[in-house]
Each structure stands twice: as C-alpha cells, then as structure tokens.
Amino acid sequence: MPELVDWRRDPAVARGARGATSKEWATHVHELWRVLARLDADDYDEDEDGKDVAGDAEAARTTSSRIRLPYPAVVPGERFRETYYWDTYWIVLGLLTSEMPATALGVTNNLLYMVTTYGFVPNGARVYYLNRSQPPLLSSCVSAVYEATRDAEWLRQALPLLVQEYAYLTRSERTITVRDTESGEVHALSRYFANTTRPRPESYREDVEVARRATRRLEDAVAKLDVKRKIYRHLASAAESGFDFSSRWLADGKNLETIHTCDMIPADLNGFMLRVETDIARLAREALVSLPVSEDEIYAERVYLNHLLEKFTRASEVRRRAIDAVLWDDDTKRWRDVTFEPLVGEDARAVVRDVGELVFACETPYVSDFTPLWCGALDAGSERAYEVVEALRTSKLVTAKGIATSLVESGQQWDWPNAWAPSTHMLVEAIQLYAPREEKYAKELAHSWLRTAYQAWKSTGFMHEKYDVCDDADSVGKGGEYVPQRGFGWTNGVTLRLLEQYGFPDDSVNCVE
C-alpha cells in the first residue's frame, strides 16, 4: 500500500469521536487515503487497454494517457484512477481534517502545475481532458491549504497562477454579455464551453449514439454534421460542469439529444466565478500583509499585489451585481440558470443580449440554484440569505436521507433521487456562514447525510460516489453513464469534515452511539 509522508494512525477526528461508531467510521475513512494515493507518475496499475503494467515504469509512460504530475495524488477511486479537478477541493478538506497538510499541499500543487503547463486546470489528469476544465475551485484549494499552513511564500507563488487560470475562465467564448435595459448596465457572465466538436474519447460510443438520435430525422448531410458537432460540444461542456449529466442541460428535461449546455448561463458557475474573484482579492491582501516592510526589492511585488487586490475586489463587486440582476429570481428566492437563443452563425464574443431575451431554464429547483449563497452572493446575516435558506427548506429537495440534486426523475445521475457529497457540504457551510441563526438546520442537513453515508458503508463495506435518498436498502446512488463507483475521494473528505464539525448523529435507528 502506498505510504504518504504525513499519514498517521488515529487522527484528531477519530481521537475526538464521542462514541465507538464515529471512531470506527472516521478511522476507516482516514485509512482510505492510503488506498486512493498515487505516489508518483509511474504509480499505475494498468495501461489504456487494461494490461497490467504495475512496476513497469516505461510501459506506463508509453501506453498511458495520464498527465504525469510532480507530487503524490489522491484520486476519487475505481474508474476514476487519476486526479480530477473539482473533486480535489473536497479531498483537500478531508486531508486537512486528517492532519495531512503536506499531502493536501501536494495535490494542490499538482493543479497549479497543470496551470503552469497548460494555462488552466483540465477536467482531469488525462491528455484527452485538455479541451475542457471543471468547476473552478483551485482558488478554494489554495485558500484551504494556506489557512492550514500559513506559508506566505508559497501563497505569493500561487497567486499569479490563479490569475492565469482566471484569464482562461474569462475568455471571450466563455463569456455572455447581457444588457440590463432598465439600468443600462452591461454584465459579463460565464458559461461552460468545451473546446471540442468531437465525441469525448472516454465516452465515445455513448456520444456517437446521442448524436445519431439527435440527427435521425435530418437528411441534409451538412445540416446533420453541424448538429452533431454542436451536440458533441454541449455534451463535453456538460461534463465540464461536473453535472454530467442532468436534466438541467436538457431542453425537454429528459432526453440527452436535446442537450444545450452552451446556450445557458449557469447559476452555480457564476457563483464559483464570484468565489474565485473574492478569493484572489483576499489572498492578495494576505500576501501583502506577509511582505517585509522595509525591503526595497519587494517593491514591485507590493505593487503587483495591490493591483490584484484592487482588480479582483472590483471584479467581485461587478460579478455580484450581474448575478443579482440576471440570475436571481425574486419570486422563488433562489438563483436560477437562464437560457438564451443562439443566433445562426453568431460570434458570441460580439453579441450583447438584452436581459429580456433570457429565460429561466427550469421551473423546478436544483441543488445548484443555491450554490451562489456558498460563494458569497449575499451578505452574511442578511434578510435575503435567510430567504434563500427558507426556499431550500421548502424546495422538496431536502429529505430525511439527504439533499437530492433535483426533483426530476430523468435517469441521469445528477437528478432525483441522488444526493452528492459536494452539494451537501456547500449548502451546510453556506448556512453556517451566511445564515448563522439557522445553524441548527445546517446540523440537521449534515446529520441526515452522515446517516445515509454510514448506512451505505455498513451495508456494503464501501464509501460511494453518490447516495439514493429513496433507497432504504443500501442507499447507493445509481443512474447515468456508468455503474455506481466506490472509493470515494470527495465523499471521504466531506464525511471527515462533517464528523469533525458536527459529530455523528445520535438519533439514527441503526447508528446509535
């Protein structure tokens, strides 16, 4: 089993457990970091055809599509045998909860390395992922690691790479410009936009089949090819969103051939972008404070950091207004995805749409509608923040076994009845930070998810990628392109973090401490 330099038995989250149940569970989950560790670029089990190449570094290098990373990695598990972008944030939180700051630093440095190499963080550490990214949480990883290590020199080295990634995220093809006809203000908002018009290599047959269904009634070869290319981009862009797949992206809410991801302005993505902007401004301020006062040689760095502080403070204020003007639905007290009608032959970089041309995408709520609260779209303790929490409470997404992703039964994995670790953590923390009078509700949400994950672990012996809020047997989530996965990186991270913050629930029928 691979050894991580800072892995120790009996971490604080297990030592501090109030009962035998939580101690046993936390200890097991902590052990899984060693199972999911990949210590170096040659730590591969098999090549792309499934041939065993363990111990054969040359075979691994020449047959694998993996991107070689400089530091030990912690992977999600099973079919996901390499680093994935947004998974890494919750893995980092779990590693820090396990008192493993060196490993957390390393997996974050792997993401920074990919920015240095490619100008952005790809979806995952595979060469075929270089045409898309994932929800941008690199700045959140850097923030978490810096908070744990207080390594100011490392932070100052990381900041320019966060700025470099931001330049990629705000490229013109990823930006939709919207004019508020009442105020006259022009807003720049983000969309997912993969740089490909071909099937995804990792899901080639599935994508080809979706494109075939989408074009089966077309006879003109040119028109058919055009539709297929758009479908492939929409599919890859949905994969970039992390919600692959969900009825969110489907025009009819059920069939993949109606996917139109690039024709949408997602509420959660723009929340994430706000968080990036806020993070960079705050981290620039932290870096400024860390600089020596009297050394002349750091003058240029001080000027640069002041520039970042001013630029990204302003950018976050502009983004906040844009989210409020375009994505907030005052009737439902939540943010919502909006759609726009693509123009034939349009160059998205040159089009300014009036806000009246945009339409809210889905009537029913999605867990992603509430993500902007976690990202700081509202002031902490504000009346509107509490209205958002009440909207979540009455949304029917919240069940006794966790927070469902949506109310739509589409058969896709990011829909009813699946509950996911990252969504749960974001909402629990959002309530903690922005609606502190609802701390009891945050604890209830954390405990409902912990009970479900624990039940599945006791029933199956594994931690899982997602959970079914309706399944009274083993609660393992299902649906989507592949069979349920075990491991599982971000589930382990959220479990440890919530156990540390809230302890194990005492009121579960089968899980009494």
Show the residue positions of the predicted features.
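Short glycine/serine- and small hydrophobic-enriched flexible loop segments
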Residues: 93-97, 140-147, 275-286, 374-377, ...
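Alpha-helical support elements that line or immediately flank enzyme active sites
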Residues: 84-114, 368-380, 424-437
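Aromatic/His-enriched, Gly/Pro-containing loop or helix-boundary segments
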Residues: 115-158
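Amphipathic, well-ordered alpha-helical segments in soluble domains
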Residues: 87, 103, 107-110, 134-137, ...
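Long, repeat-rich segments with strong aromatic
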Residues: 260-287, 413-436
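Extended glycan-interaction surfaces of carbohydrate-active proteins
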Residues: 1-82, 106-125, 179-264, 322-419, ...
